[in-house]
Amino acid sequence: MITIGLLSDTHGFLDDAVFKHFADCDEIWHAGDFGPDVAERLAEFKPLRGVYGNIDDQKMRTQFPEHLRFSSENLDVWMTHIGGYPGKYAPQVKSEIYTKPPKLFISGHSHILKVMYDKKIDSMHINPGAAGNSGWHRVKTLIKFCITDGKIHNLAAIEIGNR
């Protein structure tokens, strides 16, 4: 079993609540738009996986990929910043998501927390919303969940305060 702390769209701001809520996590996953210094602080705290977002600079784009496909506890995961969601996948992922669907598809960008199951492709979609102060969202959010033998469980949406 592995416990994951998932966040996105920090835009250079990392709320101290992230460290409290993710204290018992084994890994942190960031779905892009880190902004300055966020990746370093997260990587010092826990093992970090992530993708760059549309506001991330060249340094971040050399450190993190645009798309990250990997396996965690026998769960096929695909993470990208601009990916859309079931029924409205982004053009750059649409073809592959239907031909080689992951069991878990993670995206950010919209600043809207969303957890949806796509029964057409037997895949869970998660967008953790935005954990930073920049953007139009009103509440900063995180997602925390566990993976055991290819299954997601104990998923929680966490509100960490107003923007």
Spans of features found by a protein language model:
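Active-site glycine-centered loops adjacent to acidic/histidine catalytic or metal-binding residues
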Residues: 9, 33, 53, 81, ...
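N-terminal active-site segment of His-dependent metallophosphoesterases
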Residues: 1-48, 56-74, 79, 138-141, ...
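Pre-active-site segment of Zn-dependent metallo-hydrolases
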Residues: 13-16, 79, 84-98
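Short histidine/acidic/glycine/proline-rich micro-motifs that form metal-
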Residues: 56-57, 83-86, 131-133
